[in-house]
Amino acid sequence: NLEVPRASEEETWNQVLADYDKAIELMMSSSPKSGYSNKYVALAFKSEAMLYAGSVAKYNETVTGRLTGLGTKTGVRVIGFDEDRWQEASKKYFTEAYKAASEVIKSGVYSLYKKKWAANDPEAQYQNMVDMFSDLSNNPENIYVKEYVYPTSTHAYDSYNLPLTFKAPLNCGVCPTADFVELFDGFDRYPDGTLKVTTGNSCTEGNYVMYDSPMDYYKNAEPRLRAYVIFPGDVFKGKEIEIYAGVYTGAAPVKPLLSDYSY
């Protein structure tokens, strides 16, 4: 039979849960060597998967006539959860996510990376988070790490994402968006919550706010944001990063290039 009915989404997540539980049962508590899995790696992945499953169960929606979630031949719900099942399923998956994460925490094997962290010191907190991603020497926060070694096991992440300052062959492929930056504290804002860049009540009103240095705009930004995003004028790998989106030279009011200047 080449037309075996697909399992429902709930059945699929239940199988994922069972597979993780079996892996947790069979695996050792410690990795035999760096880069290998162990019981707590499986628990961490299980927690992440069950958090996603619980979110799908609780928040999924269907669009009538466009996305029903039901197979046309079998009527099996292959997308989302039935109305009489989502509450129970989401509670089950969220509980499994919590239990798995709690077991990892209570094991004492892993902990937050705080080698350079210091209370009330934004610069130390920023540097601590930067180092967290590159310090592989006894980093207590690393649960599972995929290691790369030149020339046998490499990646092209830097080539695709480095700023133009470094003249990488494929750089600037990924840039953070303004709405991502808006998720963090430390900025002046318009009444609607967006980042304030002019003297008016919106980005289409008033004059641009002027700074002596591009970094002045970010001086109060959360340390973790600075660790995630390279700001114009910040120093990265020993170089000052120049990022421009045009140069404003006059005192004239803002004149949008397009009819809608918002982002």
Regions inferred by a protein language model and the residue ranges of each:
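N-terminal cofactor/phosphate-binding cores enriched in small/glycine residues
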Residues: 1-5, 25
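Mobile, glycine-rich extracellular loop/lid and propeptide segments
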Residues: 1, 15, 19
